[in-house]
Amino acid sequence: MSMSIDSNKLLLRKGDMKLDNYPTCAVEALTRLETLIASRNKQNMVMQIISEFIFLERTPKDGDVRKSQALPISQMNLFQEFQLIIALIEYFSRPGRDATRNAIFLSLFGSHLTPQRSKLLSRLISTAVSGSVAPLLSSAGTWMQQVGCKTPLSLEVAQNIVSDFISYSRKTPEQLKQLPMVGPHFAANFMVAVADLYLNEQRSPTLNPPPDALLDTITEWMMENPTLCQASQQPLVLPAGAIAMPFTTPLAGLLRWVVLAPLVSNRSAYSNLHLSLLRALQQLVSSGESTALPSQDLMQIVKSLQSYCARLAESKTDPQADAAYQKCMERFAQAVQIALSSNCITNQIQLLCLLESLPPHKLMKIVIEAHKK
């Protein structure tokens, strides 16, 4: 169906926006967007259609300067949200080009969302996980990379998945366990985000471990497929002219988990995850400017260990006699050794110098001396 528009108004009529016509108008709008989205000079029109006919957002009148600076307000009720989620699931499940699907998804959910769109996005992705909707999860993985896996939007999506499938579920659903096979790129980017939520002193003054079921799920993913972390390096399928944002692998965040875990937990799952990460590092092939283990992420681990050692000093405990610290350093040294050998750490000398500032550990000392030459 062609999309003809005069200079003042869209072909889609206001009368089409009656509640009894929803979500028909949203479905029609999605179809029409496919022909518009390739035209760079029609992006404002695309955004207007999305806001008005898909999300039912009301924009304040231009005459009121104060109101015009406010975010558009969605007039959708819960039932209409449910209808839209079903319509989007069906739309993204249709045969079509990945580039078109990704362009539509990025237009629907950009990097600056209203609270209503953000909540709907989280519900949409959880529904896609529950229904194993591979095409939508593929687009969601692309979206996460484009907006940043550690941005508040991506973290909200990750936290919502944890809440839906872990926190409020007695048993981890099979759909979540099978996620790497259904949507490997999304699963890898989900791990980047969720790893940032736990055992991270930049987000909480205390080291909060991940829920046991989440740890077990990610450990199972990594044990079955150590190369899953590399799925985030897959080339993105974007519309013409779009620039792919740098990828981030989950390796650094998960490494922080296993290194710092002895300070708060003695679960054996961390040992299994550690071994899987070592295998993943061994299989890693560094390419381009984006490396698997940015030194600043590893330095964050060092700072957490320094803080722990400072607390040990206050209690007059020798780090060499502290079993938790020794276990942390053993895991850290093993990972650093393999990562350095694989040449996948940036600013290696700076990292080695910072590692020397930690209380001495026999294995780490050997690693530092071997690579500082």
From Swiss-Prot:
**What InterPro entries does this protein map onto?**
INTS15
Q: Which domain of life is it from?
A: Eukaryota
Keywords of this entry? Nucleus
The answer to whether keyword Signal applies is: no
Where does it live in the cell? Answer: Nucleus
GO cellular component term, pick one: integrator complex
**Which protein family is it in?**
Belongs to the Integrator subunit 15 family.
The entry's function note states: Component of the integrator complex, a multiprotein complex that terminates RNA polymerase II (Pol II) transcription in the promoter-proximal region of genes. The integrator complex provides a quality checkpoint during transcription elongation by driving premature transcription termination of transcripts that are unfavorably configured for transcriptional elongation: the complex terminates transcription by (1) catalyzing dephosphorylation of the C-terminal domain (CTD) of Pol II subunit Rbp1 and Spt5, and (2) degrading the exiting nascent RNA transcript via endonuclease activity.
Quote the subunit structure annotation: Belongs to the multiprotein complex Integrator, at least composed of IntS1, IntS2, IntS3, IntS4, omd/IntS5, IntS6, defl/IntS7, IntS8, IntS9, IntS10, IntS11, IntS12, asun/IntS13, IntS14 and IntS15. The core complex associates with protein phosphatase 2A subunits mts/PP2A and Pp2A-29B, to form the Integrator-PP2A (INTAC) complex.
Q: What is the official name of this protein in its record?
A: Integrator complex subunit 15
What is the name of the gene encoding this protein?
IntS15
